[in-house]
Amino acid sequence: MKVLLKNGTVINVFTGEKEKTNVLIEDEIIIGVGDYDDSDADKIEDAEGKYICPGLIDGHMHIESTMLTPAELAKVSLLCGTTSIVADPHEIANVCGISGIRYMLRASKHIPLNVYVMLPSCVPATRFDEAGARLSAEDLKM
C-alpha cells in the first residue's frame, strides 16, 4: 500500500535544512520525496504543520537499565522518533546468564521497535565483581 504524506516539513538530518514537500511511502519504506499527487497513492495523510525525518537509531543502550520491558520501551521510544536500538544486555547477563539474553531476544521479537542485541563483553563485569552469572564464548553460540 502506498501512503502519501502531503505538505510536511522534511528535515535533512545531515544538513539541518527543512523543506516543505511530500513523501511517498510504500509498505513502510520511503520511496520518494518531492512532487507527488493524490493519484500516486492509495492513502493520503495531511502532514501540514508536522515534521518528517528518518527513524532515529540509539546505537548503544541497556534495556534493563530503563526498568521497562522491551515492549514498554518500544512505546516510549517510538513516540520520540527512535525506531531502532542496539541493545547491550550485559547487566541482565551478569545476573541471569544466558537465560537473561534469551529473554531479551524473545521479548524483543514481535514489537514495533527494531532491536539488535549485541553479545555482552563483560560477564562477569570485572574480576572484583560477582553478580551471579558467568558466560563463555561457547554459551553465546546460538
Report residues per predicted region.
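Short, surface-exposed linear patches
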Residues: 25-27, 32-34, 46-47, 67, ...
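Short N-terminal helix-initiation segments at or just after the protein's N-terminus
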Residues: 28, 55-64, 90-94, 119-122
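Short loop/turn motifs at secondary-structure junctions and domain boundaries
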Residues: 12-16, 66, 131-135
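Hydrophobic alpha-helical membrane context
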Residues: 19, 70-74, 100
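Divalent-metal coordination cores built from histidine and acidic residues
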Residues: 75-142
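Histidine-rich, glycine-flanked metal-binding segment
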Residues: 1-4, 10-54
